[in-house]
Design a protein with these regions (language model features):
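Short alpha-helical segments enriched in small residues
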Residues: 1-147
Length: 147
């Protein structure tokens, strides 16, 4: 389906990058790999209307994935990646390399659009690096609001 063809597959890579660090078990709780739109809906609570109107690869879906993961995992921080890593699946409107990353920290959710170039592996790797950077920024900004 649409989600399977278009999913960037960055979620598993992101979880792997995090748990490769010693001591990660003290901060990393769970991960969701939701290639199919049905999984995005069932596991993360992404609305059917969001997927129909904006598609799996969109700011709106990235935000709903992040806030849904936050709620499902009862976590303090959640991050989502949805995009088109290629080599196919891209369109003129949504080309290969288009990635949306969402971050939710204690109920405050943002999403950002990225456009990466290169092969599938490079796009996925860049998406994971961008997700870690965005998550760090999201945590720091959220913490500074509390002071």
């Amino acid at each position: 389906g649409d989600g399977l063809r278009r999913a960037c597959g960055g979620e598993g890579l992101l979880a792997g990058r995090i748990v490769n660090v010693a001591g990660a078990s003290s901060v990393f709780q769970t991960g969701y790999v939701t290639y199919a739109n049905q999984a995005k809906r069932r596991l993360l609570g992404v609305k059917k209307s969001t997927l129909r109107e904006f598609g799996a690869v969109s700011t709106q879906t990235a935000k709903e994935m992040a806030s849904g993961a936050l709620a499902a995992a009862k976590a303090d921080v959640a991050v989502s990646i949805t995009g088109i890593a290629g080599p196919d699946g891209g369109t003129a409107q949504k080309p290969v390399g288009l990635v949306y990353i969402g971050c939710s920290v204690q109920g405050h959710t943002i999403a950002q659009e990225y456009r990466f170039s290169g092969n599938r592996e490079k796009i996925r790797d860049n998406a994971v690096s961008a997700a870690l950077t965005l998550t760090r920024r999201c945590i720091l900004e959220n913490c500074s609001k509390k002071e």
